């Protein structure tokens, strides 16, 4: 609420106090050549090291990067060592300047050149990797703009207004580095600023040039043309310096065009440190105020009025509502927000399992996270319906009279919308699918998971109406087979002109080539528990009219579940035969040395029990198939003994 996030700091780090600007530009150029690029931590460590190195200025007069590298402590943090290594290599590549020619006699002086024609521009023979790298005290060399240079400068000043301190600092560094001519400065102005700002700057520059020409400039010749023309001459470095200063001074008269709509909208957050809030205000004023405008009164006023209530109370109690900025920062230095952020200890989650879910059969989640409702474990104890829980039984709900359906209508889909609210007994729990109810003819039924009860004593056969589009619909009995990938229909349901394709089918009896055909015509299958037919784009055709199978392709469309109730049958006792060979004959015989003191009296009950005749036991019949084997305890079987052991087998 009211919190404005801080804007990034100035993209150009400021040089440490006591270091010349052209030396600091050398370090910046070397740092930006690092791969990957430098971070703010690298610049912080570089400035920290240079502050220490400036106490020994032996390396700076003239500058000697090798001597500076020897002052670097071993294991110094950051990438200062890499920056110094780049500077040492670059300094070794720069050729030494040739000595000036000796002065010639007055008798062999060359004729004076025409002052109206500037001398031609001479490209330097050896381009420098770092343009500002020059001996101490020597002026920089002129270098025209390149597109990448203009783009880099525009990116640096994109968040600052023309004439702001950040804008002027970047432009001054660029002018000092490239030593541009009047034409280069005009190109830079048109690339960075809008046409309105360029027009205002041009008017202010003309007035400053007129005042300077009237006042008089060292080296300016009125007969050689205007100052702009003479400043384009690379040899006239004095005039070019004067023109550059006038060009920079013309920005002071431009109106401030801040990026922020209002400085009053910069508010301190409830948990934001006070120094971070003041830093955001300082950056906003630097980007918006014209250079030369007093910033401290505005900054002190906003630092108090836009602070949060707790910091305002601290400043009022100590009498620093309009004090210097340092006193205000010290007053709120010990303030910490009362609302502590809660640390949530999140239990690490296990990776999703690869096995299928026990409820829906899909992999990728645990069964406790499954979105499918839990199916009932068995039929309802009240109505014996296997499709719902006891709490959802319609016998526990008030009956609603329903109109009788038409005689020829098939069983409709299970409805998803219930006309009366559910009455959940014993509270909570997972809800099961709605009960099997008739849907009104004027309602739109929606299909949910139907449960098909089957008799385990019979084959899973269901009556279905087949429409092959080439003959009249026919009703047949089809086998429900969840192991068949495709539906199989007899060829008697199709007309003689139905297009069929040969295909090979792999079944339990092996692979067949000519028993089944493949049809590409759509087939409609109407099941008794669905109103909408199942549409199959293709199916198998049995040429011998032996099979009619509803496969998985049809069952998946209706999302059916086969319910097989458990049948209670009496246990059947069947004899089993024990193996004659145990499979342990390859092991060595045990030693005959007595290893343990055995008590013969303690083993008599076991011998007595093992000598009893065969015992039979009948277990209580339980649902499902359960096998219980009983055998006689006897001595280990000798090799070649083929005696068998019989016992009861309970199914």
Curated annotation (Swiss-Prot):
Protein name: Gag-Pro polyprotein
Lipidated residues (N-myristoyl glycine): 2
Enzyme class of the recorded protein, top EC level: hydrolase
GO biological process: proteolysis; symbiont-mediated suppression of host gene expression; viral translational frameshifting
ZnF locations on chain (CCHC-type): 355-372, 378-395
UniProt site positions, description: Cleavage: 130-131, 344-345, 449-450, 574-575, 582-583
Residues at the active site: 481
Classification via SMART domains: ZnF_C2HC
Sequence motif PPXY motif, location on chain: 118-121
Ranges for domain Peptidase A2: 476-554
Sequence motif: PTAP/PSAP motif, positions: 124-127
Region of interest: Disordered: 93-142, 631-651
Compositional bias (Polar residues): 641-651
Source organism of this protein record: Human T-cell leukemia virus 1 (isolate Caribbea HS-35 subtype A) (HTLV-1)
Keyword Protease in annotation: yes
GO CC, alphabetical: viral nucleocapsid
Modified residues (Phosphoserine): 105
Signal peptide boundaries: none
Keywords: Aspartyl protease, Capsid protein, Eukaryotic host gene expression shutoff by virus, Eukaryotic host translation shutoff by virus, Host gene expression shutoff by virus, Host-virus interaction, Hydrolase, Lipoprotein, Metal-binding, Myristate, Phosphoprotein, Protease, Repeat, Viral nucleoprotein, Virion, Zinc, Zinc-finger
């Amino acid at each position: 609420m009211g919190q404005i996030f801080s804007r990034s700091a100035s993209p150009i780090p400021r040089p440490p106090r006591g270091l010349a600007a052209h030396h600091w530009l050398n370090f910046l150029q070397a740092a930006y050549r690092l791969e990957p690029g430098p971070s703010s931590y690298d610049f912080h460590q570089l400035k920290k090291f240079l502050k220490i190195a400036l106490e020994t200025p032996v390396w700076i007069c003239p500058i000697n990067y090798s001597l500076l590298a020897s002052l670097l402590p071993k294991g110094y943090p950051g990438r200062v060592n890499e920056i110094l290594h780049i500077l040492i290599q670059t300094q070794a590549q720069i050729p030494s300047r040739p000595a000036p020619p000796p002065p010639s006699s007055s008798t062999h002086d060359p004729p004076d050149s025409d002052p109206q024609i500037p001398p031609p521009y001479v490209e330097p023979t050896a381009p420098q990797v770092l343009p500002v790298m020059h001996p101490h005290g020597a002026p920089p060399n002129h270098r025209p703009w390149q597109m990448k240079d203009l783009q880099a400068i525009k990116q640096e000043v994109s968040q600052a207004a023309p004439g702001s301190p950040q804008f002027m600092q970047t432009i001054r560094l660029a002018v000092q580095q490239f030593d541009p001519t009047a034409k280069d400065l005009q190109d830079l102005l048109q690339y960075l600023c809008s046409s309105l700002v360029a027009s205002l700057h041009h008017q202010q520059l003309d007035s400053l040039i007129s005042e300077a020409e009237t006042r008089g400039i060292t080296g300016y010749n009125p007969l050689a043309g205007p100052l702009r023309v003479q400043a384009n001459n690379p040899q006239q470095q004095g005039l070019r310096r004067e023109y550059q200063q006038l060009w920079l001074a013309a920005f002071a008269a431009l109106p401030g065009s801040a990026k922020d709509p209002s400085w009053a909208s910069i508010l301190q957050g409830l948990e934001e440190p006070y120094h971070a809030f003041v830093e955001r205000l300082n950056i906003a004023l630097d980007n918006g105020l014209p250079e030369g405008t007093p910033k401290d009164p505005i900054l002190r006023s906003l630092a108090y009025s836009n602070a949060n209530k707790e910091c305002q109370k601290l400043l009022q109690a100590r009498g620093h509502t309009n004090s210097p900025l340092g006193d205000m920062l010290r007053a709120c230095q010990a303030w910490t927000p009362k609302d502590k952020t809660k640390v949530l200890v999140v239990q690490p989650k296990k990776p999703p399992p690869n096995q299928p879910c026990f409820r829906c059969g899909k992999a990728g989640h645990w069964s406790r996270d499954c979105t499918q409702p839990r199916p009932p474990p068995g039929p309802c104890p009240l109505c014996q319906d296997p499709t719902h829980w006891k709490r959802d039984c319609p016998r526990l709900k008030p009956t609603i009279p329903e109109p009788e359906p038409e005689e020829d209508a098939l069983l409709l889909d299970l409805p998803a919308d219930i006309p009366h609210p559910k009455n959940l007994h014993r509270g909570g729990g997972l809800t099961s699918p709605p009960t099997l109810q008739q849907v009104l003819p004027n309602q739109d039924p929606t299909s949910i998971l139907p449960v098909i009860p089957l008799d385990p004593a019979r084959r899973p056969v269901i009556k279905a109406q087949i429409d092959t589009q080439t003959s009249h619909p026919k009703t047949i009995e089809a086998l429900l087979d969840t192991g068949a990938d495709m539906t199989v229909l007899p060829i008697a349901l199709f007309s003689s002109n139905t297009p069929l394709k040969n295909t090979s089918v792999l079944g339990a009896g092996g692979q067949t080539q000519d028993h089944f055909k493949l049809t590409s015509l759509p087939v409609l299958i109407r099941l008794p528990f669905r109103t909408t037919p199942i549409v199959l784009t293709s199916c198998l055709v049995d040429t011998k009219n032996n099979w009619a199978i509803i496969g998985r392709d049809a069952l998946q469309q209706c999302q059916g579940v086969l319910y097989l109730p458990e049948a209670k049958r009496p246990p059947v006792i069947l004899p089993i035969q024990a193996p004659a060979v145990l499979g342990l004959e390859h092991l060595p015989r045990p030693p005959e040395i007595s290893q343990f003191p055995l008590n013969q009296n303690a083993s008599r009950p076991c011998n007595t029990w093992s000598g009893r005749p065969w015992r039979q036991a009948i277990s209580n019949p339980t649902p499902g198939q359960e096998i219980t084997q009983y055998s006689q305890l006897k001595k280990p079987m000798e090799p070649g003994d083929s005696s068998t052991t019989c016992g009861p087998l309970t199914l």
